């Protein structure tokens, strides 16, 4: 139903734009009428043209590299996290790596699965 309301508006706007002269075609030029001939360029003009092409190419490659660097930076930011779970995992990893040093420096507290069911007289031996 909405299409039938839109169609007359579309046709009317097309006619208004056509009458205003917006849809006039550009004059057709054949390839033979082209004024640009690379054979008649001077050496200075060729150097300027080459420099302009190279400058555009370098700018294009620079913008592509910046976009890739931004994408890499975004993925690196996603990996680094400061939430409590991430910090806990980092601390657990550092504790597991330094576990042997902790066992050497501190005495055992007799807590855990090995201490379950032991009596106080067994612990005093």
From Swiss-Prot:
Q: Which domain of life is it from?
A: Eukaryota
Residues in the signal sequence: 1-25
Q: Which residues form the propeptide?
A: 26-77
Q: Got any disulfides in this one, which pairs? A: 81-86
The keyword Disulfide bond appears for this protein: yes
Q: Which InterPro entries match?
A: Calcitonin-like (IPR021117), Calcitonin/adrenomedullin (IPR021116), Calcitonin_gene-rel_peptide (IPR015476), Calcitonin_peptide-like (IPR001693)
**What UniProt keywords apply to this chain's record, in alphabetical order?**
Cleavage on pair of basic residues, Disulfide bond, Receptor, Secreted, Signal
Principal location class: secreted
User: One GO molecular function term?
Assistant: calcitonin receptor binding
Q: An example of a Gene Ontology BP annotation on this entry?
A: regulation of cytosolic calcium ion concentration
GO cellular component term of the entry, any: extracellular space
Q: Where in the cell is it found?
A: Secreted
Q: Tell me the protein family, please.
A: Belongs to the calcitonin family.
From the Swiss-Prot or TrEMBL record, give the protein name. Answer: Calcitonin receptor-stimulating peptide 2
* Gene (UniProt): CRSP2
């Amino acid at each position: 139903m909405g299409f039938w309301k839109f169609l007359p508006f579309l046709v009317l706007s097309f006619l208004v734009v056509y009458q205003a002269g917006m849809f006039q075609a550009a004059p057709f030029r054949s390839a033979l009428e082209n004024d640009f001939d690379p054979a008649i360029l001077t050496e200075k003009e060729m150097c300027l043209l080459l420099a302009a092409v190279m400058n555009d190419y370098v700018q294009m490659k620079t913008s592509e590299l910046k976009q890739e660097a931004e994408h890499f930076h975004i993925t690196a930011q996603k990996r680094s996290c400061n939430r409590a779970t991430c910090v806990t995992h980092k601390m657990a990893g550092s504790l597991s790596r330094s576990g042997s040093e902790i066992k050497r420096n501190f005495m055992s507290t007799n807590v855990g699965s090995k201490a379950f069911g032991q009596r106080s007289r067994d612990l005093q031996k």
